[in-house]
Amino acid sequence: MENVITIKAFEDNYIWLIKDSQSQHCIIVDPGDAAPVLTILEDQKLIVDAILLTHHHYDHIGGVDALLSARDEKISIYSKKKLFDRCRLVNESDTLSFFDGKLSLQVMEVPGHTLDHVAFYNDELLFCGDTLFSGGCGRVFEGSFEQMFKAVSRLALLPENTKVYCAHEYTQNNLIFAHQIEPKNKALLNYIQQVSKKRQQGQPTIPSTIGLEKEINPFLRCQQQTVINKLQSHLGKELNDPLSCFSALRQYKDNF
């Protein structure tokens, strides 16, 4: 089993460090800031094998150059777009193997937040950057609502116990909006209480799971009548399909 270590960065970013349980080798996901990563690498005497980049936004890649400068390892970088000279470009359904074959991660192209956005996953772990958050999803900056809807819908098809490692601690704010959409959702009400306790104690709310998100995340619930009814009431018009519902939901959240 691999250990996933949470590294906090900036105000609400999460950088993920995946450590091989049988060695000092590790992988880093979305290192927006090098300083907190280097601290852990030095404290635990870790060797970096690879850096995985979900997309090109600076708060996800800003620490790469400093990490490469500070470490002697021959670190491979994986991304959809050529962001650094050392990048190895990945595409849909590519399989990446690490730690002498003990860890495999597949690539899923999930454009919407950005056009180059990818997720890295297996049946147990999902590193989804800014595509899916706990209780929400990313803003659509470069893609279309249709692309984002397809992206989160594909993620929702992963096994329900898949742990969701997104890149930001947005959960509490997302749940305020989710409660606005489904105020009587019992699973959501329970989760709001759990998240409140964790945040009061300074604990992260991530990882979530796919199963939980399907119960509480309105962006994965666009076929639920409660969500449709709320949006139709808000807009004063009928929504005829899940994509229309998702698009209306994302626009509502953008101005919430």
From Swiss-Prot:
Keyword Translocase attributed: no
Cofactors (names): Zn(2+)
Similarity comment: family membership: Belongs to the metallo-beta-lactamase superfamily. Glyoxalase II family.
Signal peptide: none
One Pfam assignment: HAGH_C
Protein name per UniProt: Hydroxyacylglutathione hydrolase
UniProt key word Hydrolase: yes
Chain positions recorded as Zn(2+) 1 binding sites: 55, 57, 113, 130
E.C. code: 3.1.2.6
Pathway where it operates: Secondary metabolite metabolism; methylglyoxal degradation; (R)-lactate from methylglyoxal: step 2/2
Keyword terms, alphabetized: Hydrolase, Metal-binding, Zinc
Alphabetical list of Gene3D superfamilies matching this protein: Ribonuclease Z/Hydroxyacylglutathione hydrolase-like
Subunit structure: Monomer.
